Every structure is written in C-alpha cells, then in structure tokens.
Amino acid sequence: MGSGWLLRSIICLNGTKKNKSNRGNVHSETSNRVKPVESSSAASTKLTVEVAVIRIQKAFRAFKARKRLCSLKSARRFNSLIQGHTVMNQTSTALNVIHSWYDIQNQIRARRLYMVTQGRLQHKRLENRLKLEIKLHELEVEWCGGSETMEEILAKIQQKEEATVKRERAMAYAFSHQWRANATQYLGQASFNLGKESWGWSWKERWIAARPWEIRAQCYVVKPIKPSKKPEKSSPNNVITKTSAKPDEVGNSKKPGSG
C-alpha cells in the first residue's frame, strides 16, 4: 500500500512537471508569435497618429487661412465703405459750394443789372429835367423879349419838336436805304465803300453830324425888337423885360393928319 501511494505521487509530480513544461513551451511559443503582431500594430498606430496629426494641421491651417481671408475681406469692405463715405462727403460739400457760388454770382449779376438800370433811369431823369429847364428858360426869354402870346410860343415849340422828329426819321430811313443799296451793289467783295458821290456824306459822317447822344437844346431865334420910348423895367428876379409895341398898335397910334 505504501509503495503504490508513492508511485502515484511520483507519477503525479511527473505529470505536473510535464504540464508545466508544456505550458511553458506553449507560452513561449505564443509569446514569440505575439511579438511581431504587436510590433506591426505599434507601427500602424504610429502611422495613424501621424496621419491624424497631418490632417489636424491641415484643417487648422485651412481654418486660419479662411479666418485671415475673412478678416481681409472685412477690412477691404470697411475701407471701401470709408472711402465711399468720404467721397460722398466730398461730393456733397463740392456741390454745396458750387450751388452757393452760383447763387452769389446770380446775386452779383442782379445787383449790377439793378445798378445799371437805376443809373440809366437817373440819367434819363436828369436829361429830362435839363430839357425842361432849358425849355422853361427859352419860354421865359421869348415871353419876356417877344411880342407873341404863350399859346403861340408853345405851338411853335411843338412844331419844332415835330420837325426834329421827322428829320431824324428821314435821316434814319436814308441811312438804311443807303446801307442796303451799297451792300447789294458791292456784294461778294472783301471791302466796299459807301457811295459818297450820290449822298455826299457817308452814313457814319451823317450820324456823327446828327450827334444823337447830346442833349438837344432847342435854339430859337428871337426877332429884333425896336427900342421903345419907355424905360426898361427890372423884375424881382433880375430879369430885364423889354416892352415893345405891336405893329397894329403902332399903326393905330399914328394920327390921320400926321404925315
């Protein structure tokens, strides 16, 4: 009994040793097989990490580039808006200045025109006043020195004025016809001369002789009055008045027996 138990224990120990040795061999074999697999997996993980890093870097660079591009676009838009605003301000100010300058020029022109018209009106008034004073003076002289009545003197002055107007119209008509005749006669020539043989004077000489720019003072010829026996009387205005007798009165004053 004792020997059998020892054999069994020895056999079990040998079996356990064999199992352990087999397990060690199997473990060594499996470890040898797993090492290249682990190395290949480590290399693949390194490659994936590098690819991921590259992709992340690319994405980050693209993001930064897009962000920079957006900032540049926004800056360009901002600059364009600022420039457009400044241009609009400049154009508006320029237009306002132009409008104000145009208004000032219109006011200056209107003022000049008003001053010219006022000067002409004042000149005409002065001329009319001078003419009226001259006529009144002539009327006073004729009334004081002549034997005609006031109505006769006024009628004579009116006739003279009408005669001067008719004379001016006739001269203007003659000048216009002279110009037309000479223009049709010398049509197509570079230089032409007004016919002095037919008219005597040229239209320019006639116009200068007429002197339309001067104030026309009517000249009246006072007939010589025979001195009377009565002494001359001095008026309060220091105007010497002459008394003359009419021819009818002189004839009636003579007596039928005289002579």
Curated annotation (Swiss-Prot):
The record, for InterPro entries, names: IQ_motif_EF-hand-BS (IPR000048)
The superkingdom of the source organism is Eukaryota
Q: What is this protein called?
A: Protein IQ-DOMAIN 10
Report the function annotation for this chain. May be involved in cooperative interactions with calmodulins or calmodulin-like proteins. Recruits calmodulin proteins to microtubules, thus being a potential scaffold in cellular signaling and trafficking. May associate with nucleic acids and regulate gene expression at the transcriptional or post-transcriptional level.
The ranges of region (Calmodulin-binding) come to: 61-71
> Where do the record's region annotations for Disordered lie?
18-39, 226-259
**What is said about its interaction partners and assembly?**
Binds to multiple calmodulin (CaM) in the presence of Ca(2+) and CaM-like proteins.
Keyword check for Nucleus: yes
IQ domain residues are 50-77
Q: Where in the cell is it found?
A: Nucleus; Cytoplasm, Cytoskeleton
Q: What are the alphabetically sorted keywords of the record?
A: Calmodulin-binding, Cytoplasm, Cytoskeleton, Nucleus
UniProt-recorded Gene Ontology molecular function terms: calmodulin binding
Q: Which family does the UniProt entry place this protein in? A: Belongs to the IQD family.
An annotated GO cellular component of this protein is: cytoskeleton
